[in-house]
Amino acid sequence: MDFLWALETPQTATTMPLNVNFTNRNYDLDYDSVQPYFICDEEENFYHQQQQSELQPPAPSEDIWKKFELLPTPPLSPSRRSGLCSPSYVAVATSFSPREDDDGGGGNFSTADQLEMMTELLGGDMVNQSFICDPDDETFIKNIIIQDCMWSGFSAAAKLVSEKLASYQAARKDSTSLSPARGHSVCSTSSLYLQDLTAAASECIDPSVVFPYPLNDSSSPKSCTSSDSTAFSPSSDSLLSSESSPRASPEPLVLHEETPPTTSSDSEEEQEDEEEIDVVSVEKRQTPAKRSESGSSPSRGHSKPPHSPLVLKRCHVSTHQHNYAAPPSTRKDYPAAKRAKLDSGRVLKQISNNRKCSSPRSSDTEENDKRRTHNVLERQRRNELKRSFFALRDQIPELENNEKAPKVVILKKATAYILSIQADEHKLTSEKDLLRKRREQLKHKLEQLRNSGA
C-alpha cells in the first residue's frame, strides 16, 4: 500500500500545474504567465462566485474561443498592480473625499473596506477604467469602448458600471455623518493601495478606430455642467444629455440605456433609486413640451411645422358622355347675355358638385350610377352598330348568305355595289331621256298625219 501511495503522489504533483493552467485559460493576457504561481482555492471560489452573481457577464463568443483555445482579449487591459503615485488615485480620492458643497460629510472607509472595494473593482475587466476616470472626462466613455466594444457589448458594460457606481454612491451618502478629518485620513491610507490602475490606458486602441460614431455630444449644455450629486451616475447623465437637445431623435449612440436598480436591502437606497428613475422619466415626459416651446421660439428659424395627418377627399369629376349613335350637333354662337347666364349656371353646378364632395357616400353612389348608365349606353351603341352592319350585309348580293363576313369586307363590297348601282342609274336615266324624246317625235308626226287626212 505504501508503494502504491508513493506511485500516486508524483502523478498528482505533475497534474496540478496542468489543472491550474486550464482554469486560468480565460483570464487576461498579461497575467497568464504569472497566474499559476499566485492563484489559490480562495481566488478560484471568488471568481466562481463572481460569475454566479453575474457581476461579470461572460462574453457572447466565449464558447467559440474555448473551442479554438484562443484568448478573447482584444487589446491589453490595464495593469492591476497597486502603487503610490498614479493619476488614477486622485480621481478616486477626490470622489470619496468630503467636498465643499457637502455639509461636513466624508467617507468612512477603513483600510479593509478600501481593499475589499479594490478587489471587487479589479474583479470586473470592464470597470477598471470606467470607475476611476473622471465622469466629466471623455475617457470615462472611451475606456469602456476600448475594453469591451467587440466582446461583451455596450449594454452589459453599461449595466455593470451603473450597478457598481450606484452601490458606491449609496455607500458614500450613508457615510456623510462622520467627520471630514476621518475622511481625509481614510483617503490618505487608501492611497497605499491605488496606483497604476490606468497606467496601460495609453497602450489601448483609440475608440475612434473601432467605433465610427461620435462618443458623446459636447454641444449639449447639461452634459458639460453636470452636478456633483450625479457625478457617479453616468447612465442618467447620458440620458439627460440625450434628452436635453431639442433635435435628439437621431441620436447616434446612448451608451447607458437605463439605470438598473441596485440589489440592496436598505430603504434609503431604494428611495434614491426611485428618485433617480423618476427624474429620468419626468425629463422624458417633459421633453415634448420643451421641444414644442423651442420650436415655437423665434430664435430657431428652422423649426419644423406640425405634422398634419393626410386627409383624402373624393370630389365629383364631371364626365361628359358622348352618344355615338346620335347625329353630330352643330355649334351655335350665343349672345353675350346668354353666355353670361351659361357661365353662371356652370359656376352653380361646380358649387353643387363641391358640396356633394362633403358626403363621400353620395358621391360614390353617383359615380356608380353614372358608370352604370355609361355601360348601358355603350352596349346599346354597339348593338345598333352591329345591326346596321348586318342590314348592310343583307343588301349586298355577294355577302347575303355569308354570316361570318368581317366588317371590312362588308364595307368594301358595299362601296363597290353602290358604285355599280349608281352607274346603272345613270344609264337608265339616259335611256329614259332618249325614250321621252322619241315619244315627243312620234306624237308630233301623228298629229301631222291626222291633219293631212282631214
From Swiss-Prot:
Domain notes: The 9aaTAD motif is a transactivation domain present in a large number of yeast and animal transcription factors.
Record carries keyword Lipoprotein: no
Residue numbers covered by motif 9aaTAD: 116-124
Biological source species: Mus musculus
Post-translation changes: Phosphorylated by PRKDC. Phosphorylation at Ser-344 by PIM2 leads to the stabilization of MYC. Phosphorylation at Ser-77 by CDK2 prevents Ras-induced senescence. Phosphorylated at Ser-77 by DYRK2; this primes the protein for subsequent phosphorylation by GSK3B at Thr-73. Phosphorylation at Thr-73 and Ser-77 by GSK3 is required for ubiquitination and degradation by the proteasome. Dephosphorylation at multiple sites by the PNUTS-PP1 complex promotes MYC stability by preventing ubiquitination by the SCF(FBXW7) complex.
Protein name: Myc proto-oncogene protein
Tissue expression summary: Expressed in the intestinal epithelium (at protein level).
Any single GO BP term: myotube differentiation
Residue span of motif UBR5-degron: 370-379
